[in-house]
Amino acid sequence: MKKHLSILLAATVGMLIIFYTESCKKIKYVANTSTDLNIYGYIKSNPDKYSSITAIVDKSGYAGFLNAYGSYTMFVPTDSAVKIYLAEVSKTLTTLTEAEAQNIVKIHLLEDTLTTASFKDGKLPTATMYGQFLITGVINNSGTSTILVNRQGTITSANIKTGNGLIHEVDRVLKPAAKSVAELITADPKFSIFKQALQATGYYDTINTINSTDPKLRRWFTVLAETD
């Protein structure tokens, strides 16, 4: 009996010593990170294509979090896309304000990782950091299928993996919607009778607002409009 107790005691002490020794070792935690360049690092390391959007990100003050770990999807316009955009708005990289740069970055950026395989014809499941949803659709261009984003630009290089998300290169700078649903209906003459009905019922004023860019506060409308 004493012999069995001695063996049991020795085994217990041995286990405690092993446990103590193991617990004293430095624990190496596995973080959910990557050795890939982050989004900002990637665009900055490709100045032949992305020097303009890099300058815009720098001016926006968002370089810090775009170079930190997270889960983002960014539609990155090429230098030629930014050049076209700046000509359209009569601006240069120098004359863009910080607020304008921030809005450009925010309309191209989602706090989610979305591959093109998850795109469907219509609204993406996550709003941009600007607060508006982007829409995508497949178009046929000379026998080649391409993805059109917001009816403004096509994806020219997709699913570029970075340490904090994905990049989809686009050939145009995306622009946020500037008109309310009511204004879009008014601008199309084939909805003239429907517009009158909206005004008569008081709903025209309800949908004639572009409110907060905060996605938590913004109200969204879907109108099934009848043509004349």
Segments from the language model and where they lie:
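Mature, structured domains of secreted/extracytosolic soluble proteins
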Residues: K2-L8, L16-D228
